[in-house]
């Protein structure tokens, strides 16, 4: 019984570390210009949702295509940084993540906030819903 209780207590911290690892891998992939590897953090599903700029895009391929168009070269991609990451476990297989993003580019530094819903899938923790907003440029 004690082993079962310990395993249950350890799971949330393991899950948080696994989710943080997904975000770290995404940041690394982005910063080497690899959008396809960045997209490995998202669930490869038609139900994956990305919300930004007053538009909801549905489906992993649609989200990937949006990134490819918007960030078509390394100059547009810049260097990505995440900060103020807060992971809240909703259940043993779901979590919400709140954080900040920032791109450092030659002529600007767009930044904003994001809320992600992660789900534990057979292939590991993946983003199933991403709501990202940019701060005003003022």
Give, region by region, the residue ranges found by the protein language model.
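A solvent-exposed, acidic/Ser-Thr-rich amphipathic alpha-helical stretch
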Residues: 35-90, 102, 108-109
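A short, structured loop/turn motif at beta-sheet edges
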Residues: 87-95, 118-124
């Amino acid at each position: 019984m004690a082993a079962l209780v310990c395993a249950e207590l350890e799971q949330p911290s393991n899950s948080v570390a696994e989710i943080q690892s997904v975000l770290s891998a995404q940041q690394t992939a982005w910063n080497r210009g690899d959008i396809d590897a960045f997209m490995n953090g998202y669930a490869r599903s038609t139900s994956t949702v990305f919300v930004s700029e007053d538009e909801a895009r549905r489906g992993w391929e649609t989200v990937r295509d949006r990134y490819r168009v918007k960030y078509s070269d390394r100059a547009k991609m810049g260097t990505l940084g995440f900060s103020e990451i807060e992971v809240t476990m909703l259940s043993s297989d779901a979590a919400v993540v709140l954080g900040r993003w920032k791109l450092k580019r030659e002529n600007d530094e767009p930044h904003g906030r994001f809320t992600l819903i992660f789900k534990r899938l057979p292939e590991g923790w993946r983003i199933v819903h991403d709501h990202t907003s940019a701060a005003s440029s003022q």
